[in-house]
């Protein structure tokens, strides 16, 4: 069976089911199916052996034991190879080298009151837990009641953070059960407030902190987290452009943690195989720098050559320490986000969520709205109010998607209009605009005599099909602006996306009122329905988990524009809009987000295989015949099942006590 960088098990889903069904009377602890990779390092094998304590007798002979792809022991329970041996899996029992307090303090292994009586005996927990054994459902009921006692979103965010560092399974299971309620607590809009207060609310460190004053320590610091095959997905931030609230210094590590929580929740990446990284390059936030409790470097942000050299060392270290990991850039400032993506996207599989992820989900919403109103993308005119990383990412994604579907690039760019704090971006602004902005600049002659600083006047002349807000200018989409748009567009498509909620360019209730419920609206934060119309949230959690999962499973060498476009088309196809009825909203609900991510990942994988950027089929099938390589199904539905079989689920699994070689690196215990 195929060894996976995503999985922590070596038994296929159906194999495990058959095995446990055939042996229902056996104690769970007697099934030594390996979890693996949580404590492997480089090319050395994990030398796990089952203990011979009276509380846990070895239930099989050495002849029954075979080496798994990661060098651990697992019971050989099948005579013939399984027909789906190339499918990866995240099921099976867990081998655990910890016991007592160490086990209870490990968020990846801890079950709290759900440890079975046999596990309590085997792991020396009997004196440390109340006698009643709870189910996960009972723990979820208790945790949710505790959460409901809390009155503010930030207090609930603190509770969820505490739960995450105690028990990963319970944390993710609780979010999944109450996903619509809790995603806004662990992510936008509440996470922005938690990031701003990071140094005052700090309790326990998570992630890796890299200091620009110690660039030679980068590789060593990254390696403390695991071996070369221990990490699938890395989110890194220098914290300059956090969630619409700007420079937050060291607190930006929280956005990396939040994004990775969504990667696990939505994309099924195992929580023990992700890595949040904070690049501390100083801060220009004077309030933070004056704060005696601030935990990061208090000098001004370092830029120029020293910054670039630091990033170069970081990229080289990632390629060396975690050569197969996908790198996700998050909340870099506008001057760095795009250039770093363009510089490194072909050196390693990398992705910028603010540029590509935002663009992807907005593009999908736009396609869904156009399809619902029988309009063509090539005839669409889009006015983007806010020309930073997000606005440019949306513009580029629209252009790339048009090009992918046969429109000339220059013609596509003519359909995009960008406004920033100076107004509509014109060719005369070249000295004060970035190269990425200038490709969308309009002729000064064409706009002579028009007040290009007025959003109302620009809307009057552009007559946009779609108006997008990425400005963080609260209330910018005024009644006169929206009514002017509605004059020329019976079904205006309006996306106020700025976060947090207080910075939205308009609220959905006003947009629907000013257009007599004719607007097709999606926002950047959650809002309640308006007159029976569900307001979709253009949340990046609809895009980056699926794209990231697809890149991980395909072993992509790069994440191409066509791979992202494939994800966009798949997301647009999942729109719940019905002909003549716009009440269901533009995007699928959060309650189906796991399936949504799996379908996006499938589209990404198939596109990567078509383009030749996928390395998965170059990998040897562990335990297979010499030269036998992995084969990924080309049929969409079959590939979808292949993907789903590899997605981690927040469920408790039986635990096996083992000893391990102390010289072998122990990752994230």
UniProtKB/Swiss-Prot annotation:
Subcellular location per the Swiss-Prot or TrEMBL entry: Mitochondrion matrix
Biased composition (Polar residues): 33-43
Keywords: Metal-binding, Mitochondrion, NAD, Oxidoreductase, Transit peptide
Entry binding sites for a divalent metal cation: 330-331, 354
GO CC terms: mitochondrial matrix; mitochondrion
UniProt cofactor note: Divalent metal cations. Prefers magnesium or manganese.
Stored SMART domains: malic, Malic_M
Binding site for NAD(+): 387, 390
Main subcellular localisation: mitochondrion
Annotated catalysed reactions: (S)-malate + NAD(+) = pyruvate + CO2 + NADH; oxaloacetate + H(+) = pyruvate + CO2
Gene Ontology biological process: amino acid metabolic process; malate metabolic process; pyruvate metabolic process
Cofactors (names): Mg(2+); Mn(2+)
EC assignment: 1.1.1.38
InterPro entries (UniProt xref): Aminoacid_DH-like_N_sf (IPR046346), Malic_enzyme_CS (IPR015884), Malic_N_dom (IPR012301), Malic_N_dom_sf (IPR037062), Malic_NAD-bd (IPR012302), Malic_OxRdtase (IPR001891), NAD(P)-bd_dom_sf (IPR036291)
GO molecular function: malate dehydrogenase (decarboxylating) (NAD+) activity; malic enzyme activity; metal ion binding; NAD binding; oxaloacetate decarboxylase activity
Binding residue positions for fumarate: 142
Segments of this protein annotated with the region Disordered: 33-68
Active site, UniProt feature: 187 (proton donor), 259 (proton acceptor)
Binding residues for (S)-malate: 499, 539
Additional free-text comment from the UniProt record: Present with 10500 molecules/cell in log phase SD medium.
Described function: NAD-dependent mitochondrial malic enzyme that catalyzes the oxidative decarboxylation of malate to pyruvate.
Similarity annotation: Belongs to the malic enzymes family.
Protein name (database record): NAD-dependent malic enzyme, mitochondrial
């Amino acid at each position: 069976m195929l060894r996976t960088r995503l999985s922590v098990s070596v038994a296929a889903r159906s194999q495990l089911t058959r095995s446990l069904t055939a042996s229902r009377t056996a104690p769970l602890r007697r099934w030594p199916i390996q979890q693996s990779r949580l404590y492997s390092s480089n090319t050395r094998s994990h030398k796990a052996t089952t203990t011979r304590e009276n509380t846990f007798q070895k239930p099989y002979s050495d002849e029954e034991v075979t080496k798994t792809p990661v060098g651990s022991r697992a019971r050989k329970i099948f005579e013939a190879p399984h027909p789906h041996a190339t499918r990866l899996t995240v099921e099976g029992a867990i081998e655990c080298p910890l016991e007592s307090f160490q086990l209870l303090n490990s968020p990846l292994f801890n079950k709290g009151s759900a440890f079975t009586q046999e596990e309590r005996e085997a792991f020396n927990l009997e004196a440390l837990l109340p006698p009643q054994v709870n189910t996960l459902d009972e723990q979820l009921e208790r945790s949710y009641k505790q959460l409901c006692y809390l009155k503010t979103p930030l207090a609930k965010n603190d509770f969820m953070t505490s739960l995450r560092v105690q028990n990963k399974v319970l944390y993710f299971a609780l979010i999944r059960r109450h996903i619509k309620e809790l995603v806004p607590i662990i992510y936008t809009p509440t996470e922005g407030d938690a990031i701003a207060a990071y140094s005052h609310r700090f309790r326990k460190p998570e992630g890796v902190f890299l200091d620009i004053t110690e660039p030679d320590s980068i590789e060593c610091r990254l390696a403390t987290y695991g071996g070369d095959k221990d990490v699938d997905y890395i989110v890194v931030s220098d914290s300059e452009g956090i969630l619409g609230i700007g420079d937050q210094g060291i607190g930006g590590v929280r956005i990396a943690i939040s994004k990775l929580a969504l990667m696990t929740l939505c994309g099924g990446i195992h929580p023990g195989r992700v890595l949040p990284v904070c690049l501390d390059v100083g801060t220009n936030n004077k309030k933070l720098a004056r704060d005696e409790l601030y935990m990061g470097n208090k000098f001004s942000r370092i830029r120029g050559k020293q910054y670039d050299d630091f990033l170069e060392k970081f990229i080289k270290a990632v390629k060396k320490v975690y050569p197969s990991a996908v790198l996700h850039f998050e909340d870099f400032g506008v001057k760095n986000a795009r250039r770093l993506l363009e510089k490194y996207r072909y050196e390693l599989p990398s992705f910028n969520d603010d540029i590509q992820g935002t663009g992807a989900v907005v593009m999908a919403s736009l396609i869904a709205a156009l399809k619902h109103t029988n309009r063509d993308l090539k005839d669409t005119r889009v006015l983007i109010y806010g020309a930073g990383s997000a606005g440019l990412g949306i513009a580029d994604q629209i252009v790339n998607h048009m090009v992918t579907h046969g429109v000339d690039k220059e013609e596509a760019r003519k359909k995009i209009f960008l406004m920033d704090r100076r107004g509509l971006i014109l060719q005369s602004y070249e000295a004060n605009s970035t190269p990425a902005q200038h490709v969308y600049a309009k002729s000064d002659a064409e706009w002579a005599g028009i007040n290009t600083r007025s959003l109302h006047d620009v809307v009057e002349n552009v007559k946009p099909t779609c108006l997008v807000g990425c400005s963080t200018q609260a209330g910018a989409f005024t009644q006169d602006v929206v009514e002017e748009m509605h004059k020329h567009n019976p079904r205006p498509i309006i996306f106020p996306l700025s976060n947090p909620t207080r910075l939205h360019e308009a609220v959905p209730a006003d947009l629907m009122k000013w257009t007599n419920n004719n607007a097709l609206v999606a926002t950047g934060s959650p809002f309640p329905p308006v007159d029976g119309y569900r307001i979709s949230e253009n949340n990046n959690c609809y895009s980056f988990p699926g794209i990231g999962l697809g890149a991980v499973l395909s072993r992509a060498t790069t994440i191409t524009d066509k791979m992202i476009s494939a994800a966009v088309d798949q997301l647009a196809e999942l729109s719940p809009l019905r002909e003549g009825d716009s009440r269901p909203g533009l995007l699928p609900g959060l309650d189906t987000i796991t399936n949504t991510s799996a379908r996006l990942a499938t589209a990404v994988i198939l596109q990567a295989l078509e383009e030749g950027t996928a390395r998965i089929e170059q990998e040897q099938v562990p335990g297979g015949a010499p030269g036998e390589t992995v084969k990924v199904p080309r049929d969409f539905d079959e590939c979808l099942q292949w993907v789903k079989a590899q997605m981690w689920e927040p469920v408790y699994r039986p635990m096996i006590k083992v000893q391990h070689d102390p010289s072998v690196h122990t990752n994230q215990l």
